[in-house]
């Protein structure tokens, strides 16, 4: 089952958190569609912002966006001008006050979506797909990932018949729920047609409790920038907790 299902959806509530945090009730469908409109607008407005994830929270009077980006300066704009424009447009869409929190991604090579988008840009520039895949894998493993797999589908290299090719390094334990695996899908529109890109990145195994939304609600009101702790390496195969209270037994005094 782990081989077929979306790795992020499979781990929701275990090591992964939701990207839409609110209660909709009877208006659930309308709010879900509105969330999709918000994300599409922000990504279209800042296509080169290096945005990996947008988490949306809702209250009665306010909509809060938490944007994880590798290029916070591009998202904020000069003197915060870009963020202010985005707030005005989103207020028209939602009809509520909008708050935007911005967190910087220190290691974009560990974000599956950013890796996929990077490969897509190289394919559009007619760089060899094998070279693009190998460079992405080397860069991700160099910054501390335990495994990465990249799969491309389409008319690779301009071939007459579409096919699938993939490269993998390290391990990707898709059946292990405590495994922190990032997954993303991207597309590259080339002169030969559309090429699909799938990326899996294994960051390590998570033991004990974990904050599923570490960056949500931590920033001050308005646009702010901070470091992103979400892609900090978890316990990468470290020792398990001792059972039976072995670590809590007091040493007897002789």
From Swiss-Prot:
Keywords: Ribonucleoprotein, Ribosomal protein, RNA-binding, rRNA-binding
Gene Ontology CC: one annotated term: cytosolic small ribosomal subunit
Residue stretches making up the KH type-2 domain: 38-106
Biological processes per GO annotation: translation
Chain segments annotated as transmembrane: none
Composition-biased stretches (Low complexity): 215-238
Signal peptide: none
One annotated GO molecular function: structural constituent of ribosome
Compositional bias ranges of the Basic and acidic residues kind: 244-254
Family: Belongs to the universal ribosomal protein uS3 family.
NCBIfam families hit by this protein: rpsC_bact (TIGR01009)
Subunit structure: Part of the 30S ribosomal subunit. Forms a tight complex with proteins S10 and S14.
Function: Binds the lower part of the 30S subunit head. Binds mRNA in the 70S ribosome, positioning it for translation.
Protein name (database record): Small ribosomal subunit protein uS3
Source organism: Cytophaga hutchinsonii (strain ATCC 33406 / DSM 1761 / CIP 103989 / NBRC 15051 / NCIMB 9469 / D465)
Gene giving rise to this polypeptide: rpsC
């Amino acid at each position: 089952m782990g081989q077929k299902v979306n790795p992020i959806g499979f781990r929701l509530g275990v090591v992964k958190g939701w990207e839409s945090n609110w209660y909709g009730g009877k208006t659930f469908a309308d709010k879900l569609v509105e969330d999709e409109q918000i994300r599409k607008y922000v990504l279209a407005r800042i296509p080169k912002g290096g945005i990996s994830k947008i988490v949306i929270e809702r209250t009665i009077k306010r909509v809060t966006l938490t944007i994880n980006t590798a290029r916070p300066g591009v998202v904020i704009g000069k003197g915060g001008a870009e963020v202010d424009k985005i707030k005005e447009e989103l207020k028209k869409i939602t009809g509520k006050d909008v708050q935007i929190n911005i967190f910087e991604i220190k290691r974009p090579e560990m974000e599956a979506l950013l890796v996929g988008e990077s490969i897509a840009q190289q394919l559009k520039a007619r760089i060899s797909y094998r070279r693009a895949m190998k460079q992405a894998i080397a860069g991700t493993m160099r910054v501390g990932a335990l495994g990465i797999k990249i799969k491309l589908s389409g008319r690779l290299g301009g071939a007459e018949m579409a096919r699938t090719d993939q490269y993998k390094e390290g391990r990707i334990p898709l059946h292990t729920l405590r495994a922190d695996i990032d997954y993303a899908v991207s597309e590259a529109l080339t002169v030969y047609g559309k090429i699909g890109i799938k990326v899996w990145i294994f960051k390590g195994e998570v033991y004990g409790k974990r904050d599923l939304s570490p960056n949500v609600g931590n920033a001050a009101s308005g646009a702010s920038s901070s470091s992103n702790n979400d892609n900090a390496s978890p316990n990468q195969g470290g020792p398990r907790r001792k059972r039976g209270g072995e670590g809590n037994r007091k040493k007897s005094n002789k």
